[in-house]
Amino acid sequence: MGSDARLALPVLAALLLGTSEPPATLDQFEQVLAAQPSATAALGQWCAARRLAPDPQIRAAVISGRTTDPPGDLRRILDLSGDVRMGYRHVRLSCGGKVLSEAHNWYATERLTPEMNRTLDETDTPFGRVAAPLRFTRERLGGERGAASYCPRGTVLSHRALLRLPDGAPLAYVVECYTAQNLARPD
């Protein structure tokens, strides 16, 4: 177990064992995020620990109709030649009807299986769940309190990260915009 995971365990235990729920802090939330390679998995843990919904399943709602230009050097970051298709998803991740994050995800379609690409193109399944069999890791590139570029108003925490395959090849570049719903008291 990595050091980030060890740091997150006491936070999760305190949240699960507490009888009256204190308000969550951004520091606690960030510890849980840092302990997982997938924001989807971290949000699922957080939703369950905070009891934000009776069924702590994370669901993605694809936001269609909006095209967002990628950062200028993204093809270089993802190590993609000019003719390779880059996938893009803009989603809201929710737990029990509470929107926990809005995310922009640019990814190397050639590094996913055809079935994974089809699932991403045709369903609302979260990227982290679809790509989990690839055992990717997460390299945090930056974060800030509040809204970063690409994030909507009301964002309380923003992260930028690069997801890498076990061989080090870049899989995806993500911008994650976390909402105040993560800090809400349970229902």
Predicted features, each with a name:
Residues 2-21:
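Bacterial Sec-dependent signal peptides at the C-terminal "C-region" and cleavage site
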Residues 6, 89, 159-160:
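Basic side chains
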Residues 18-94, 98-150, 164-187:
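N-terminal domain-onset segments
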Residues 156-165:
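Low-complexity, intrinsically disordered Gly/Pro/Thr-rich segments
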